[in-house]
Each structure stands twice: as C-alpha cells, then as structure tokens.
Amino acid sequence: ILQDANDVNQRVKLIDILSHDVQRIERLITDYSQILKDEVALSKEKIKKIDLEPIIKSVVDDFNNIHKYKRKIKISYENDKKNKYFINGIENRVEQIIANLLDNAVSFSEDNKEIIVKVSKSKDKQVMVNILDEGIGFKEKDTNKVFKRFYSNRPDKFGQHSGLGLNIVKNLVDLHNATINASNRIDKKGANMEIMFPKV
C-alpha cells in the first residue's frame, strides 16, 4: 500500500493508520494472553476471608493520584457504614476486578467528571459494590453482553479497545461465586457496574 502512495501526506497518513492497527493488535494479544494466564493461575489460588474496604480504598487512591490532576476526574469512595465488609476472596484478584472496572469507567469519562465507588450490605448480608460513572452509558438493551469476550461498544473518540477487559472481570467475579451486572444509572447519564458478593 505504501509503495502505491506517491503523496508524502498520504504516506504519513497510511503509516499512522498502520501504527494504530499494530497497537490495537498488540493490546489484543496482551489481553488474551492475560486471560490464558488467569485461567491457569486461578485454579491454583485459594480463597479466604478478606476485608474488602481497604482493598477498594487502595485502588481508589491509586487512580485518584493518576487521574485527579491529569484529567481532573475525581474518584470518590462511599459506604453505608455497616462496619466491616468481609467476603470470601483472593485479595489480588479482587484488586484486579476493581482496577479493571475503574479503568473502564475512566476511559468512558470526559475530563472533569466524577466516578463513585459504593460499598454496601444488602438485607441478606451480601456485600454489594457499585461503580458509577458519568460517561455515555449503555445503548444495548441486553447490557450484560458487554462481558462477552471481544465485545466492545467503545466510540472512536474514546480510543480502540480489545473487548477483553470486562470479560476478564466477569471470569474473576465468577471465581468468587459472585455476580456482576451492567446497567444505566437511574439518577443521571452514565453506567452502573454492580457486583454482589455472597455473604460470608
């Protein structure tokens, strides 16, 4: 293709397109490799009783340090003040779940927006985590298709994506015998990712 392009500007444009395609393929390979590694590693890891709150606070702090000044995106943590939020889980995997969901929320958010991470307990003492953003929300009627491998509903302005991040999250959530649901926010425009961990 480059050989057929005589104009310098056309060559530069083609190189730019090819460069983006290479980056997209690299991300795809990296994400898919992560899935394969996780599927092997998960079978060897042991679940134990852990406190969810400090894990979430740590991830929220890390993301705030990166995005609060860079893009003026504020990430807030809230809870319903029900003391401890214990779950049966693998600490580094729970951290990965929250980080992936926050990364997804940030990538769909414009600058100067807010993302809220809420932790609460249901009446039957399940632990619920909601990650609410102010992005574009979901156009799909079946919102849970976003967890399918290689599925991506990301508009071009938010950059290209492999469509594997939320599938990795779903696999990790399943490992914890938990559930995850995607929906649009009721109070305003944006997405709501809700995880329900079974009571300990």
Where are these regions (language model features)?
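Conserved micro-motifs of the catalytic ATP-binding
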Residues: V40-E45, K82-G89
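A conserved beta-strand-to-alpha-helix junction within the catalytic ATP-binding
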Residues: K46-N64
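Short conserved segment of the HATPase_c
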Residues: F138-F150
